[in-house]
């Protein structure tokens, strides 16, 4: 039986809001406006969490700045998904000792998935004495209280309760865009893929109530947001813990029926929980972007079993082919791991053949990175690093060729795009399927839906002109 999520009481959230007011008054009594910098590593869920951290900081009187130099408060939101991300965090946190030497009253906090690992917290505690506070993803809603305690006492604080499994509604948000918005619909993961640290640091799956999600989305539409992405470690499991009879496809449909001009997206999905009902829902509603990120990770059944993915190559292909059958324009993207422990050359060839069969629009490709505490980290891994790099290059070459061929097929066609910014002399936009389009135009077009005729392409983007 699914555990129901624990919703943080409004009284507790009101207390945190009051603390924000107290911090703001404390800074006002000192006669100046403090500044805060938030640095984010990792996935879109971390981006959404950082928006809430910025919201709490602004409610506490801080101006949000884009550099750590001179900031009164620095928050680093960390990622634990791969070793490279952790190495970068350690390096950058270490460098902050010099920044703090120039600004002794500066307060430095670390949060995010790395702080859900006890060995990491111990390392920070013992080797990074200039760090003032640590909190894991479950304690994010308590950040104002933690900040106030550090400001008042000057003592370090480590809030890493792992009993977790909560939902906190109504936390203030400072969004990074006034056009595109992240909306977290659930947190955590129950899948325990053998290589993945996420369930250990984010906790078990817990879903927000549909009425709370709809309330947030309605507010975004009213504020003029035109590209809304629903977030979860596995959105296809949405609602199982609520017992309301509302699944992810139902939630998507209820949002897609709201008035307004916007595109609705989602990530990430797990193939074992993806359904034809979800594909049918995407096909039915014009506001739902015809884009599906469906990670396959490997094209070989033995490797998939070792990964604890709970589906086969054939089951995955049936889903992918069904999506393309009912939506020929469906943009399919995916994640794939190269060099999983014990992967043979023949098993790697199965991955290449799956890529050729599905013909993904884009892939996010990774070489296996062992994560301490996961089953895969203990598996025998005889494949040399050089061989893994060679396979990685072959896979990237295969996908780059396919991506270019797909893009070449768009030359001469007219596509609907949402203009989202500028890079040097060109405007940038995204198609319904998430493809990057560059074209000449005036900044007044930013934020608008337009029809653009495609005149050229590269492997990674399209070039067009407004007719």
Question: Model regions: which residues?
Answer:
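Short, hinge-like loop/turn segments at secondary-structure boundaries
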Residues: 126-128, 150-153, 246-248, 282-283, ...
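Terminal RNA-binding accessory module
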Residues: 1, 6, 378-467
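Conserved SAM/AdoMet-binding glycine-rich loop
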Residues: 105-110, 117-119, 222-345, 356
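Glycine-centered loop/turn positions within well-structured domains
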Residues: 141, 191, 236, 301-302, ...
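Proteins enriched for Cys/Gly/acidic motifs involved in redox and nucleic-acid/cofactor modification
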Residues: 1-238, 277, 292, 314-325, ...
């Amino acid at each position: 039986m699914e555990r129901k999520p624990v919703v943080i009481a409004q009284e507790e959230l009101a207390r945190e809001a009051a603390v924000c007011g107290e911090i703001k008054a404390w800074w006002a009594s000192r006669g100046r406006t403090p500044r805060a910098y938030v640095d984010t590593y990792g996935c879109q869920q971390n981006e959404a969490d950082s928006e809430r951290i910025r919201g709490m900081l602004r409610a506490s009187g801080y101006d949000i700045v884009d550099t750590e130099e001179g900031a009164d408060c620095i928050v680093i939101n960390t990622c634990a998904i791969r070793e490279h991300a952790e190495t970068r965090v350690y390096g950058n946190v270490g460098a902050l000792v010099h920044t703090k030497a120039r600004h002794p009253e500066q307060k430095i906090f670390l949060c995010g998935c790395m702080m859900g690992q006890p060995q990491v917290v111990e390392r920070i505690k013992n080797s990074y004495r200039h760090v003032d506070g640590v909190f894991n993803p479950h304690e994010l809603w308590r950040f104002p209280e933690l900040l106030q305690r550090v400001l008042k006492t000057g003592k370090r604080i480590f809030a890493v309760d792992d009993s977790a499994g909560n939902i906190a509604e109504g936390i203030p948000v400072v969004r990074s865009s006034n056009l595109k918005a992240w909306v977290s619909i659930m947190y955590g993961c129950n899948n325990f893929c053998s290589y993945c640290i996420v369930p250990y640091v984010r906790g078990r799956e817990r879903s927000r109530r549909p009425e709370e999600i709809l309330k947030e989305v309605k507010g975004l539409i009213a504020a003029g947001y035109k590209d809304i992405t629903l977030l979860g470690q596995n959105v296809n499991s949405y609602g199982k813990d609520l017992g309301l009879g509302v699944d992810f496809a139902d939630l998507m449909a209820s949002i897609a029926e709201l008035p307004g001009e916007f595109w609705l997206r989602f990530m990430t999905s797990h193939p074992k929980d993806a359904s034809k009902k979800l594909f049918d829902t995407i096909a039915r509603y014009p506001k739902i972007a015809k884009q599906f990120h469906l990670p396959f990770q490997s094209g070989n059944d033995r490797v998939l079993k070792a990964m604890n993915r709970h589906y086969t190559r054939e089951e995955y292909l049936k889903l992918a082919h069904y999506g393309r059958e009912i939506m020929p324009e469906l943009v399919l993207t995916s994640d794939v791991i190269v060099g999983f422990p014990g992967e043979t050359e023949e098993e790697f060839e199965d991955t290449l053949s799956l890529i050729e069969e599905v013909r993904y629009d884009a892939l996010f490709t990774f070489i296996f990175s062992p994560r301490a505490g996961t089953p895969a980290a203990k598996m025998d891994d005889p494949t040399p690093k050089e061989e893994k790099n060679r396979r990685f290059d072959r896979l990237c070459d295969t996908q780059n060729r396919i991506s270019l061929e797909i893009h070449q097929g768009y030359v001469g066609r007219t596509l609907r795009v949402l203009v989202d910014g500028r890079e040097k002399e060109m405007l940038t936009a995204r198609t319904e399927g998430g493809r990057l389009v560059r074209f000449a135009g005036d900044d007044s077009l930013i934020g608008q839906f337009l029809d653009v005729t495609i005149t050229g392409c590269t492997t990674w983007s399209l070039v067009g002109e407004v007719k």
